[in-house]
Amino acid sequence: MHTDWSVFKGLASKPSQAEWVKANVFLLGDIHNHCSLSYGHGSLDHAIAFACQQLDFFSVTGHFAWPDMNDDAMNIPEEVKSYHREGFAKLRLGWGEYLAKIKASKTSGIIPFVSYEYHSFTYGDYTIVCKDLDTLLPPEPERVDTRLADLVAKNDAQASGVICMPHHIGYKEGYRGISWGHFNQKASPLVEIISMHGCSENIDAPIKYLHTMGPRSRHNTMQGGLALGYRFGIMGSTDHHNASPGSYGSGRAGVWAESKESNSIWDAFLQRKTMALSGDPIMMAWFIDDRPLGEVVELHDHAVLDGYILATERLSSVEVVSDGETIRSYTDFPPNGSNKKRFNFACGWGSRGMACDWNISIRVEGAQVTDVVPRLRGEYIVDPLAECDESSELLASVRHCENSVHLVCRTAGNVTPTTDGTQGFSFGLEIEEEYTVIVDVEAVYAGQSHTKTFRYASSELKDGPTAEYIDGFVSPAFSLSDEIDSGECLLEIHENIPVKKDGYIYLRAFQKNGDVAYSTPIWIELR
């Protein structure tokens, strides 16, 4: 995404903040997702290729072990135990090939990490993320499996190069939700709070828990852990089970790092310079007394908060949260009248289960395409036992070429009326007074090929979004948004906040398209 921090006038009078923004880059990643490496769907090759389309860093995660799976009190069906055992064994057999392919992915310009996963009723589920790309799996236990227990209790992420990241923490304790009583922030500098399971920022957070594993429970949330005094960075991951790291809408991580290099990203993990995103890369650079997110600040009686929020879509609200309470809320994001605009494009719809292969080009006359933000989704399959045709893994892709954008993808309708199966992207324009957006569509649907061209004058694009169908009613369609003024996508905050006790402050932002972003807190200690 094109980032022009000069739009924030307050940075000019905040030299240390301006220097921090200049010295750091915002990166997008997903370090917890699955494929057929253990149990799941889709090949590792496809997972790596999919990650390269829209992420800066990634991992593909193997299901590794479930130490207390045989707890009779939990009444786990035998077929569930069986596919877990088979998946764990499959991971061990394929680990060498996995490491080789993960290491080879570096040549594509993406930064890889190694990861595997423990399930646990007692501790909650953990993704074990490893910096060393030659990491071997732990040996099998001789008797009682204490490997996860030992990691959670004894690991020091700063020294070991291993992060124990709890995920889908919102489930009930004892039912694979987090056990805050066993949590160790030295072992776990990161906690995942958004994924395809839902959002666990707080008990009422948008994106409900709707998986078969159950609802959110009591204090098993980000705010619940913070209230206990823990300090951790927050992450989003897809937890996608169909070879689609970074699948749009399922959860992603935003990281502020000094560079797009493995060491810098790992340092950012350890320093808690992280954000949890549902989809779009909503960037929040913010400070208390000139100290950035993830840090601990000593104060007397007030906090000077400065924030700079840059979204890819119209913002609907931004909130400042202190110790679980919303203390500031911003809902006014007026157009600034600049020549920088944004648009959203999406294609899909049509009859459920009927594939449409798209080849789309968007060209612009009288304006310059400044940036493109992909919104690519993997096919949404959760059940490891579900049938899935993996004979042809079409890779969706978005390319920005000079003054045009090209999208190649397949859609097959929406699984339910509330499940988004579209593919698309956001793009920025630097415009002249008048301009034209041209959409060239090639689509193959129901055995027929359709080729169409649509032209939209800038005057039309100020009058609301457009919708076009390729072959009449309930055929696949595309949508091009109306013109979005860049002022509607940004916010600058400068606040003096009274502080009466030790605690934490963080930001959360909401876009009008439903995407959300949460920042890691800044912790406050009174002098």
Task: List the predicted regions and their residue ranges.
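Extended, charged catalytic domains and RNA/DNA-binding interfaces, predominantly
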Residues: M1-R527
